[in-house]
Amino acid sequence: MTELDQFWPACLARLEAELSSQQFNTWIKPLTAEAGDEGIALFAPNRFIMQFIKDRFLPRIEELAVELVGELPVELRLGAPTARPAAPVAGNSQPKAKEPAKAAASAPAAPSPAKQAAVKAIGGSHESTRLNPSFTFDTLVTGKGNQLARAAAMQIAENPGDQAYNPLFVYGGVGLGKTHLIQAIGNHVFQKNPQAKIRYIHAERYVADIMRAYQHKAFDEFKRYYHSLDLLLIDDIQFFAGKNRTQEEFFYAFNALIEGGKQVIMTCDSYPKQIEGMEERLISRFSWGLTVEIQPPELEMRVAILMKKAEADSIKLEHNVAFFIAQNVRSNVRELEGALKRVVAYARFTSQNITLELVKEALKDILAAGNRQVTVDAIQKTVAEYYKIKLSDMHSKKRSRDIARPRQVAMALAKELTQLSLPNIGDAFGGRDHTTVLHACKTITEMRASDADIAHDYEALLSMLRN
């Protein structure tokens, strides 16, 4: 093995140690390398990843090249190596999958006449995807809250069955666009290959279908169908909790699809290890591929969502009006779009144009609820109870991590949920300087993107304080 051949495995090992598992699996792992006479070529599977690598990681890769083998030109290309693939990344506990099967799988055997009703009960036509055609990547507004999830989704849509992203587990609060995101994958795959066998299904419907299949003695057909899919998208998988028979059947379906190189995508309202009533063997498998979070949209993204929705529905919406709605409806995309629908309906019923005054009247109950501001005292008390520390620790000078981290979380929550300035927030935390508050907010924002536990804690506290 030449020095160039040894470079990429060594570089991968260094990057894996430096980056979070999400960053490494999403951006670095899909790359392949080919050593040439004068340097090394890195191949990205699509333009989106190639551009992201160029902007964020290529300088570090070039630094490692100099450090590991001396002066080494590194070239970034689109596609795949013509010679041999890069060395595999060690440490993946997932069983080796077969090569991703082409989506044009043969159709399952037709049910016997005696079981036609049962087949209909378990999902209707086998050709039906149950995808909403309006849920596409083009109609999905992207912001900091869903940037990583969208990037992973686009990669999967281009290369379904890729072991690094299989399964994809998307989690986050209610109404944040998880369903839109995973259906965008399904629609993209179907557009590329209409022969692909795709099924989108809500977890509750899957449970009901299993029960019907047993009642109608049609379980063989049910099993044959789900085991033969190219792409399975299951929404709100937390509904499997406590349903042992459903979990057992899904376990076998999951294994059959993954081992066949087929893609499985799931959404949930919480991180896999936080799901109560779910078998450990399933929770373990949920983490085989990539787990990504969707966070509540920031202000700029909320404005963009409103403007895009208004444009799609041919509604004249001024930017200042959208900004006002976005400022006052912060929880999730569903409530944001619901507020816009209420404004539009009010304008039509009263035959008025959509103005700031009309919005204030149409949303007066929402605005009244929003005006009941969360206080810093309430934030400190809630965070202290959540992390099981003393309330006085919020004001103390203690700097141990088990005290400092909850205090930083509380500062970040105070910045998001109150109208206080940074100096005022600092005063409420034992007279700290505004730069300390700013540092705390920045730290927590970065950790929410890289640490699943911190992200989960923050969202849980947000929900508790808002409700």
UniProtKB/Swiss-Prot annotation:
InterPro entries per the UniProt record, alphabetical: AAA+_ATPase, Chromosome_initiator_DnaA, Chromosome_initiator_DnaA-like, Chromosome_initiator_DnaA_CS, DnaA_C, DnaA_dom, DnaA_N_dom, DnaA_N_sf
Region (Disordered) residue spans: 84-126
GO cellular component, one term: cytoplasm
Entry-linked PROSITE patterns: DNAA
Positions contributing to ATP binding: G175, G177, K178, T179
Keyword list, A-Z: ATP-binding, Cytoplasm, DNA replication, DNA-binding, Lipid-binding, Nucleotide-binding
Residues spanning the signal sequence: none
An annotated Gene Ontology molecular function: lipid binding
Chain spans, region Domain IV, binds dsDNA: 348-467
Domain II: annotated segments: 79-129
Ranges where the record places region Domain III, AAA+ region: 130-347
Pfam families (alphabetical): Bac_DnaA, Bac_DnaA_C, DnaA_N
GO biological process: DNA replication initiation; regulation of DNA replication
Location of this chain's protein in the cell: Cytoplasm
Domain notes: Domain I is involved in oligomerization and binding regulators, domain II is flexibile and of varying length in different bacteria, domain III forms the AAA+ region, while domain IV binds dsDNA.
Family: Belongs to the DnaA family.
Subunit structure: Oligomerizes as a right-handed, spiral filament on DNA at oriC.
Function recorded in the entry: Plays an essential role in the initiation and regulation of chromosomal replication. ATP-DnaA binds to the origin of replication (oriC) to initiate formation of the DNA replication initiation complex once per cell cycle. Binds the DnaA box (a 9 base pair repeat at the origin) and separates the double-stranded (ds)DNA. Forms a right-handed helical filament on oriC DNA; dsDNA binds to the exterior of the filament while single-stranded (ss)DNA is stabiized in the filament's interior.
Protein name: Chromosomal replication initiator protein DnaA
Organism encoding this protein: Chromobacterium violaceum (strain ATCC 12472 / DSM 30191 / JCM 1249 / CCUG 213 / NBRC 12614 / NCIMB 9131 / NCTC 9757 / MK)
